[in-house]
Amino acid sequence: ASGSGSGAGARPYTSAMRRNIAIVEDEAAIRDNYAAAFAREGYLVRGYPNRAQALAAFAVRLPDLVVIDVSLEDEPEGGYELCRELRARSAELPIIFLTARDSELDAVSGLRLGADDFLTKDLSLPHLVARIHALFRRIDALRRPAAAEQVLQRGALTLD
């Protein structure tokens, strides 16, 4: 059967390539819903309700990707600050804002602080998972050695 691209058999990663995703979201029900969706796709997921707990965990080990809400508990802009702190630690860490805030100013601010994407919570779970798969696919492609680095040898002639 031809797949629609959204079936479970279309998962691009094997268990040997499991990625760690951190979700920083102060609303437990929302955090748990996203965590369950990511876990169904084979990702290892950790959730944090606030910036302080996330930073404490990230001091030990950075995840492979972070999903952050802009407003965190008593910090209306705590997600922005977390993004700034994470970007200072790693230029390559994929960061996605997933928030109810949908103004252009919010999105531009998040992207300028270093986020790779700025999405609103009305986005469907399949769409969100597809965005995450695409981000990891691009990262993997950038990490693969370029085909131009191959050496071609014919007799005494070597082309590199």
Give residue spans per PLM region.
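Short, Lys/Arg-enriched segments at the junction into DNA-binding effector domains
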Residues: 20, 136-160
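Conserved acidic carboxylate
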Residues: 25
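Charged docking surfaces used in two-component/phosphorelay signaling
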Residues: 32-40
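Short hydrophobic/Thr-rich beta-strand motif most characteristic of the beta2 strand and flanking loop
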Residues: 42-51, 57
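Short amphipathic alpha-helix used as the core "switch/output" element in two-component signaling
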Residues: 56, 77-91
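Active-site beta3 strand of CheY-like receiver
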Residues: 61-72
